[in-house]
Design a protein with these regions (language model features):
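Amphipathic, well-ordered alpha-helical segments in soluble domains
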Residues: 27, 53-56, 80
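Flexible helix-coil transition and linker loops at the boundaries of alpha-helical arrays
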Residues: 62-71
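Amphipathic alpha-helical repeat scaffolds of TPR domains
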Residues: 71-87
Length: 145
């Protein structure tokens, strides 16, 4: 599709099509430093694809009733918006593309309230996710079927 963070977009697509999902505890995704990759390139408006991809995953989880993970997914979306936005110029932050990214965040925040997804347990899970993603995945999804 020519978007950045297409691997994240693939997650939402795969969730929609999957009949069953398994948690594999080993990290299978290896980052490599490659000249010209999005990891090493200057942040531009195009990096807002990251926000769009995270919103797609959030919405997919919401549509399928996975409300117990919406807080964590919202934090990922919000963090990506803040991270990308902080690297853009003041002029870039006023563009329609940035406004669309902000709208994704607003919709997700509204959905959190509508789904009653902000609970003490969800906030605790999100806090653990923020502190250590490795530890979060180790404890939150261990031995679940």
């Amino acid at each position: 599709e020519g978007k950045l963070n297409e691997d994240t977009l693939l997650i939402a697509y795969a969730y929609e099509k999957a009949e069953k999902i398994a948690n594999i505890p080993d990290a299978m995704y290896l980052y490599r430093k490659v000249a010209g990759s999005i990891v090493n390139s200057k942040v531009t408006l195009r990096n807002l694809d990251r926000v769009e991809a995270n919103y797609a995953v959030f919405e997919c989880a919401r549509r399928h009733g996975v409300t117990g993970s919406l807080c964590e997914l919202y934090w990922v979306l919000l963090h990506s918006l803040i991270d990308v936005g902080s690297h853009l110029t003041a002029q870039e932050r006023k563009t329609p593309r940035m406004q669309q990214a902000r709208e994704y965040e607003r919709r997700a925040r509204r959905a959190l309230r509508q789904e009653h997804a902000v609970t003490p347990q969800a906030l605790g899970n999100t806090f653990r996710f923020i502190l250590s993603q490795d530890r979060y995945f180790e404890t939150r999804w261990k031995n679940r079927t």
